[in-house]
């Protein structure tokens, strides 16, 4: 496939500020929310490749998720909103099984197909540096949702996951004022978004008589996620709360609680706006969920990539992070939040 001419330069990791704000926070005034301030991105190398294309060059952009989940439908809606506004088509690809091998192959294929920019949610940051760095030598690479700060990616867009964990930890303390036993459920703790959320939770619950008795990974296997929840309920008869760090974990934990007849006895806190999660908040099976803004992750990642391709590091903010924000959704503000979601999805 014909590659268009480009100017590739090596630049310092932090460039001039590009003025673009993140999303606003939704929900009612009673909801807790957190929009973190930007923090400097850690980098392994003093310089990173950026690729600037001549004016008029047709730009090929791609968005790569880390698995197939409802969460990415909202990001896809953001990508489509960008397409409608700019007329630039963006390829949206998802690794069907959520494996590193699949995602690496997608990256390599996009390079071969002559793409100019990729926004990617990295599955295992420390294990994929070689693949990411190789791609960055041929195209503009940014991370979204799950970061790989030691790679040659140019910037990160998404949740500041440690701060999201702090918010979740505060909600856990609120739900367990006398303390108790907590179990953590997650797809893959090697993913930076997952372990940073857990770091935040562990920081907040210290000194509150709250003990994490289990940390269960499922590798994006829903059947395994459900059995993990069932096994923990059986193993810990005094379990107080189940905490899901991936979008599907909360609802699957709640279904296990319901099956065990422990509704009300075992509290559940989730992550993200999965439809089953929101339904379980309505029925009282889930107490609260920490929601991100995947719509803005999709939209902003495309917008920044487009501008980087045209203007180089002048389009990268300083620090090289854009926080899309998080908030707590519970029974009090659920109706308002669902209206906000419906408006977002109308863009797809």
Feature map (PLM): residue ranges:
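Bacterial lipoprotein signal-peptidase II cleavage site
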Residues: 21-34
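Hydrophobic alpha-helical segments within soluble ligand-binding/sensing domains
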Residues: 103, 157-182, 224-226, 273-277, ...
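Extracytoplasmic "Venus flytrap"
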Residues: 46-78, 82-83, 91-105, 115, ...
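Short, solvent-exposed amphipathic alpha-helices that sit
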Residues: 71-88, 164-168, 192-211, 224, ...
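Hinge/cleft segment of the Venus flytrap/periplasmic-binding protein
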Residues: 36, 40-57, 189, 193, ...
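Short beta-strand elements in bilobed, periplasmic/extracellular small-molecule ligand-binding domains
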Residues: 84-97, 181-184, 205-222
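Flexible loop/hinge segments that line or gate small-molecule binding clefts
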Residues: 125-163, 167, 174, 181, ...
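Hydrophobic alpha-helical
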Residues: 111, 119-136, 201, 219-280
């Amino acid at each position: 496939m014909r590659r268009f001419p480009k100017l590739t330069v090596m630049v310092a990791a932090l460039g001039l500020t590009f003025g673009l704000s993140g999303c606003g926070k939704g929900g009612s005034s009673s909801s807790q929310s957190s929009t973190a301030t930007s923090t400097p991105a850690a980098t392994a190398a003093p310089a990173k490749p950026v690729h600037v294309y001549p004016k008029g060059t047709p730009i090929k952009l791609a968005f790569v998720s880390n698995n197939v989940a409802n969460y990415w439908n909202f990001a896809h809606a953001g990508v489509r909103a960008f397409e409608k506004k700019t007329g630039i088509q963006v390829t949206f690809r998802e690794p069907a099984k959520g494996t590193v091998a699949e995602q690496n192959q997608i990256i390599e294929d996009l390079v071969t197909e002559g793409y100019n920019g990729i926004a990617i949610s990295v599955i295992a940051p420390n294990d994929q540096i070689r693949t990411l760095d190789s791609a960055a030598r041929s195209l503009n690479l940014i991370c979204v949702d799950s970061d790989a700060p030691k790679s040659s990616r140019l910037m990160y867009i998404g949740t500041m996951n440690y701060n999201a964990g702090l918010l979740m930890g505060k909600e856990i303390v609120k739900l367990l004022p006398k303390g108790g036993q907590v179990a953590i459920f997650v797809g893959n703790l090697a993913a930076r978004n997952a372990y940073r959320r857990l770091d935040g939770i562990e920081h907040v619950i210290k000194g509150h008589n709250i003990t994490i008795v289990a940390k269960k990974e499922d590798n994006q296997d829903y059947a395994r996620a459900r059995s993990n929840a069932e096994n923990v309920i059986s193993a810990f008869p005094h379990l107080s709360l189940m905490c899901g760090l991936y979008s599907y974990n909360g609802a699957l934990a709640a279904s296990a609680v319901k099956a065990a007849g422990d509704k009300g006895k075992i509290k559940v806190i989730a992550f993200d706006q999965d439809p089953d999660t929101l339904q379980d908040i309505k029925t009282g099976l889930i107490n609260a969920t920490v929601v991100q803004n995947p719509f803005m992750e999709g939209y902003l990642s495309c917008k920044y990539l487009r501008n980087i391709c045209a203007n180089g590091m002048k389009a990268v903010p300083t620090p090289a992070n854009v926080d899309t924000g998080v908030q707590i959704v519970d029974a009090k503000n659920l109706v308002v939040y669902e209206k906000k979601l419906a408006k977002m999805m109308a863009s797809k």
